[in-house]
Each structure stands twice: as C-alpha cells, then as structure tokens.
C-alpha cells in the first residue's frame, strides 16, 4: 500500500513539474482593438537572438513598439516594394514578441509578424512561427526600446 501511494505521488509530482515547464515557455496572449500579440517569456528558447541576455517584454513595451510600428513602419528600407500593402493591413497581422538585451545594453524586441488568416499557422501562442517563402504574409522587424527606433525589416520572399 505504501509503495502504491509513493509511486502515485512520484507520478503526480512528475506530471506537475512537466506542466510547469511547458507553462514557463508558453506565450501570454495580449489582444487589443489594433493588434493581436503573443509575448514570449525569456525562458522560451529561440535561435533568432544569439548570445544575448533575454527578458520578458511587458504590456507597456508592446504598446510602445506598436506605436512605433504605426508611426515609423513606412520609413523602413524595403527592397520588396510591398511595405505599403503590409502597412495598409497591419491589423490583419498577428505578432510574436521576443525580448533581448544587446551587448551595449539596449533592450530590443524581435517582432515576428504573420497574416492572421493563414491556415498553416498553428500553435502561434506556443511556438515561434517560421516559414520559408510566403511573401508579405510573413515578416519580422526589430524595435529598440532604448532608442525608440524600428530597424532590420525582413519581408519573406514569394514562393516560386
């Protein structure tokens, strides 16, 4: 009887520990009338930001970045010539936010954006959306919270 209870307790503890581990990397869902975001915690592992210190962005960080997107997006360098169309449909893009600190101490948000109606995007609140191609349905940009500046716009290539 004691062995059965002990085995049951160990099993329950391992399941609970596993659930906590999964929860520690799941994103927070932050939705407003203007944007729909996943905020990933610093515990989420990603290869996008190498050799940097991670942080979990807060709602004020996201609001500040979204304000910059609305104000500064059209000023970005765009070799694809699709930025005006992207900008016109900003509300239709979901965002994933990842925070990191650069070696010179700047707090930066990596913003992954994708078309909300894309049937191929699943589990966007649990894992980073990564695709090859897809055109302007997929893009990323960085926002420097320290300098209040957007940079490094990347719009995916079309599938050919």
Which residue ranges define each predicted feature?
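C-terminal partner/receptor-binding element of secreted or periplasmic proteins
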Residues: 134-160
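Short, surface-exposed beta-edge/turn micro-motifs
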Residues: 8, 107, 137-138
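Surface-exposed acidic loop/strand-edge motifs in secreted or periplasmic proteins
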Residues: 21-123
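Bacterial Sec-dependent N-terminal signal peptides
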Residues: 1-24
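Short consensus segments that form the blades of beta-propeller domains
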Residues: 128-133
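Generic structural motif
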Residues: 4, 12-15, 116-118, 146-148
